[in-house]
Amino acid sequence: MKTVTVKDLVIGTGAPKIIVSLMAKDIARVKSEALAYREADFDILEWRVDHYADLSNVESVMAAAKILRETMPEKPLLFTFRSAKEGGEQAISTEAYIALNRAAIDSGLVDMIDLELFTGDDQVKETVAYAHAHDVKVVMSNHDFHKTPEAEEIIARLRKMQSFDADIPKIALMPQSTSDVLTLLTATLEMQEQYADRPIITMSMAKTGVISRLAGEVFGSAATFGAVKKASAPGQISVNDLRTVLTILHQA
């Protein structure tokens, strides 16, 4: 299986990498939170752009991205607009969503973009090609904050992302029971052992699913999300606790 290298970070080998999400509403908060995040122990900074109020002003968005890049130049920067239908803060049109991601790619400020699988097949394929032409990696994602589908469906979605040339397929699902967590872990393991030729990220959300955020190295998830301050999804634990557990499991 091939790994994915972003800056000096190799994703897909060793302990799962820690991603943290910064969710600031304006440029002043972007600056202050970036300074606070700089002291935390994590591997990838995700900027959740859907929390940013001045979204229609592309210059403002990119000015904020520049602050993040300059504050933490060594950290891979993942640019993520999470759509309302997949648990995000704002709803925008597909056209605006694609344009925003293209602007991020054009800026040269971001290392990775998050692209939702169900945006539309043609738009997704074109945006992946555009990102790769500009040396930007793509985390292709799907989120369901209500339920966990069958393992076959989870695997089908991850394989579809892989077929669309995502650098890292990602899926996050809400368990309604403990057995749903096992379904997610079973699907992750089967994907990893039978189909994946690149790193994948999977997680089961909420308190019930926390084990999935810790056991990635065992089952085949290459990264996990932790919280510096406010969690960006239910079930995230603090980065310091997360690093401790990931290290224990890695060294066992």
From Swiss-Prot:
EC number(s) on file: 4.2.1.10
UniProtKB keywords: Amino-acid biosynthesis, Aromatic amino acid biosynthesis, Lyase, Schiff base
A biological process from GO: aromatic amino acid family biosynthetic process
Catalytic activity annotation: 3-dehydroquinate = 3-dehydroshikimate + H2O
Active site positions, chain numbering: H143, K170
Sequence positions that bind 3-dehydroquinate: S21, E46, W47, R48, R82, R213, S232, Q236
InterPro entries for the chain: 3-dehydroquinate_DH_AS, Aldolase_TIM, DHquinase_I, Type-I_3-dehydroquinase
Disulfide-linked positions: none
Gene Ontology terms for molecular function: 3-dehydroquinate dehydratase activity
Pathway the protein acts in: Metabolic intermediate biosynthesis; chorismate biosynthesis; chorismate from D-erythrose 4-phosphate and phosphoenolpyruvate: step 3/7
Biological role: Involved in the third step of the chorismate pathway, which leads to the biosynthesis of aromatic amino acids. Catalyzes the cis-dehydration of 3-dehydroquinate (DHQ) and introduces the first double bond of the aromatic ring to yield 3-dehydroshikimate.
Record-stated family: Belongs to the type-I 3-dehydroquinase family.
Cited HAMAP family: AroD
Complex formation: Homodimer.
Protein name: 3-dehydroquinate dehydratase
Organism (species): Escherichia coli O139:H28 (strain E24377A / ETEC)
Taxonomic lineage from the root: Bacteria, Pseudomonadati, Pseudomonadota, Gammaproteobacteria, Enterobacterales
